[in-house]
């Protein structure tokens, strides 16, 4: 005999939360009550609500769902966050579901003007829309993140987390608004996301293992990136990265791996990109081991992040740059076991056909090679 417990519903309105008002206290009370019950759902029904910076902390007594049907609006002034680097944080929860089709509106327009990270490497981080810290066996689905002040969704220390059918939007010129950043996490699956933003659609940081990205639509943005890696000492290895299917349109990069020069030692391996369509994308296929945005680095020595077991298979479409394929590896630790197969990238601009650059790498080739592989070698 299977006993099915009814899920208890905790509606924010029962705690005094009303549309067009600040529901920070009401929502915190609803979460605290729901977290103390085995099997619960926090509901925010249709409407627009103001919400200050808040942490939803576990562990909870059982599975818990955060069901957002309305729109949550962040304070537009970043000073109201009192130095915190997030707006909404879910922390140390097992069996969490975030769902409902609602919108997390970060109101980032004013904060973007204060972002000086392009000039100052030690810039102050602005608030992330949604943090997931140490979340396990959980699912995030059918939500929207809009106009975050900084990253939209940030994962840290998560295990077995699925992200499905999320929509992420911010203008293409909004700084540091990465769509989803994964760090120090494993068993992460991102499926059917629609991301248009001002930085990487998805970025994968150090300590990430077994991350699968399926059928993501990306653009505007900076593409789908592993890295940047090697900026800090004692970074953890990256491995088991799969990018399968999806379409990138008008992005400043396609699929890329980026590491800093003059880096401490590190490794990135078992990374595979396949069946991806590029529509007028700059740098559709890119390994960049001399990544140095805005001149904020030392070029005294090559990167010491070792890249190995990488494949780019069935990557097709159009490149907005003449150099459609760039495999620029480190002189100190050349890339190993790189496979390029069935690549067909056309360049329609001035200056002739697309080219392919290979530096400190000897890729294994198969299938169609357009542009011809390694037309430029240094």
Residue ranges and their predicted role:
Residues 1-378:
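Extracellular/periplasmic carbohydrate-active domains that bind, remodel
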């Amino acid at each position: 005999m299977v006993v099915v417990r009814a899920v208890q519903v905790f509606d924010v309105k029962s705690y005094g939360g009303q549309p067009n008002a600040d529901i920070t206290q009401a929502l915190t009370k609803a979460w605290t009550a729901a977290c103390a019950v085995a099997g619960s759902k926090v509901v925010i029904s249709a409407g627009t609500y103001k919400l200050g910076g808040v942490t939803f902390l576990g562990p909870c007594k059982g599975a818990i769902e955060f069901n957002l049907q309305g729109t949550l609006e962040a304070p537009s002034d970043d000073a109201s966050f009192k130095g915190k680097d997030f707006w909404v944080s879910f922390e140390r929860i097992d069996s969490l579901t975030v769902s409902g089709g609602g919108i997390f509106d970060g109101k980032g327009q004013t904060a973007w003007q204060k972002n000086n990270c392009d000039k100052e490497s030690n810039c102050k981080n602005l608030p992330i829309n949604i943090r997931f810290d140490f979340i396990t066996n959980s699912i995030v689905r059918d939500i929207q993140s809009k106009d975050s002040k900084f990253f939209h969704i940030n994962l840290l220390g998560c295990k077995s987390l699925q992200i499905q059918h999320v929509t992420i939007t911010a203008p293409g010129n909004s700084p540091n608004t990465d769509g989803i950043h994964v760090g120090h996490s494993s068993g992460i699956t991102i499926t059917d996301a629609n991301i248009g933003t001002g930085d990487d659609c998805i970025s994968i940081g150090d300590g990430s293992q077994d991350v699968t990205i399926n059928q993501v639509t990306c653009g505007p943005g900076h593409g789908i990136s592993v890295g940047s890696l090697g900026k800090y000492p004692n970074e953890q290895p990256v491995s088991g990265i799969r990018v399968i299917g999806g379409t990138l349109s008008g992005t400043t990069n396609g699929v890329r791996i980026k590491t800093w020069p003059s880096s401490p030692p590190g490794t990135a391996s078992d990374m595979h990109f396949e069946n991806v369509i590029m529509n007028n994308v700059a740098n559709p296929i890119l390994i960049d081991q001399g990544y140095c945005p805005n001149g904020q680095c030392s070029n005294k020595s090559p990167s010491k992040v070792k890249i190995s077991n990488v494949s780019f298979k069935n990557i097709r479409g159009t490149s907005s740059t003449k150099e459609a394929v760039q495999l620029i590896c480190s002189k100190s630790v050349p890339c190993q076991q790189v496979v390029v197969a069935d690549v067909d990238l056309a360049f329609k601009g001035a200056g002739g056909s697309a080219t392919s650059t290979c530096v400190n790498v000897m890729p294994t080739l198969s299938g169609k090679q357009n542009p011809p592989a390694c037309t430029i070698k240094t």
